[in-house]
Amino acid sequence: MAALTIFPAIDLKAGQVVRLAEGDMDRATVYGDDPAAQARRFADAGATHLHVVDLDGAFAGASVNGAAVESIIAAFPGQVQVGGGIRDRAGVDRWLALGVARVIIGTAALKDPEFVKSAARDLPGRIVVGVDARDGMVATEGWADVSDVRVEDLARRFEDAGVAALLFTDVGRDGLLKGCNVAATVALAGVVDIPVIASGGVAGIEDIHALRPHVADGIEGVITGRALYDGRLDLAEAIAAGAA
């Protein structure tokens, strides 16, 4: 069985490394002001993949922390995926030109699905669709808005579009260390033939152990942020557990 990929997260707000509680910009905890140094620390612990979010961009609808992301890409030898504020093809192309491996598109996946499908067809393996859920419904605009579209229905729209993965985030758990919503993540993987990345609520090594058997069900990896920053999860241990 393939390994469960561990994606340490770097969320950027005004150039700083932060974590939000439930996607609320007013509930941000600052963990550092040198994103590149944080990326190097993750690499030193064995990380081969990195998940970066331009939080200001997610709310503004355009890239805001470009310089910080560039510094991360320069510092991290593995693959970097970036999301936040990517609403058009120019935004996708700009990140890819900087060396980003995969671009995550969330809000635009709901509001402009044809753009996402076109990008996925033109750029195989480079587009990840962010499926952000609050009580089973799709949340957009930095999670500030909740739509009337069910998560499964949004995912199915991209079944044959060639997207690299679906990034499923349970917004109600994100940054709260409540534990990953394994059941909902596995359920989503069960309705589409697209790899799914779990996100939101990872509290410790038990979440890695819970997700690991479901690689066979289509779970590609898991994103973890606050558990790492708060010392509740050791990255090297998580990577080893994901590969065990």
Curated annotation (Swiss-Prot):
Regions crossing the membrane:
none
Q: What is its EC number?
A: 5.3.1.16
Under which pathway is this protein filed? Amino-acid biosynthesis; L-histidine biosynthesis; L-histidine from 5-phospho-alpha-D-ribose 1-diphosphate: step 4/9
Which reaction does this enzyme catalyse, per its entry?
A: 1-(5-phospho-beta-D-ribosyl)-5-[(5-phospho-beta-D-ribosylamino)methylideneamino]imidazole-4-carboxamide = 5-[(5-phospho-1-deoxy-D-ribulos-1-ylimino)methylamino]-1-(5-phospho-beta-D-ribosyl)imidazole-4-carboxamide
GO molecular function (one)? 1-(5-phosphoribosyl)-5-[(5-phosphoribosylamino)methylideneamino]imidazole-4-carboxamide isomerase activity
Q: Which Gene3D superfamilies does its entry note?
A: Aldolase class I (3.20.20.70)
What name is this protein filed under?
1-(5-phosphoribosyl)-5-[(5-phosphoribosylamino)methylideneamino] imidazole-4-carboxamide isomerase
- Lineage of the native species? Bacteria, Pseudomonadati, Pseudomonadota, Alphaproteobacteria, Sphingomonadales
